[in-house]
């Protein structure tokens, strides 16, 4: 089963000592090495992961100890069979927790970027985008981008995969037409300026419900 959570950066005060105490010393050192919005986004995402694991897997020791495999994909050292994925964009962080490899991505919708599509999308996806009206193309571009990023995160082998698989968003739910099988979802997001994509490496997986956290629990 896959669980999906979202948290606004406004709910994560980086100077709040109580919130900082939820994270490991190593994680805080990394966060404090960042600057500006990157620092706040990383702090928000880290707190969201802590809260998501607390809710879904309360037996996992906290603060969470996170390592990375040979491809750089993060995992929980105390619970390697608990799969998770994080993403953040501007004002939001999202987290997926699953019993299967999972990827999640959130994108703030701005303008269509044909150079990104031409460089990173499968030729069939580029052709599909070119067939759309300008009004529909922007929405489709960010939907595809979020889904492709989520697929790459679930796989864990990096961005080199982006052109090696193809996603069909004309069907519901979206389908992987070229590449390893899995389940794709585009959950409704409360902020219309963002697109959310989820990939679970399990065929016919149940669609995850999104929980938007209004606040964080007391440590």
Where are these regions (language model features)?
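Core catalytic alpha/beta fold that binds nucleotide/phospho-ligands
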Residues: 1-219
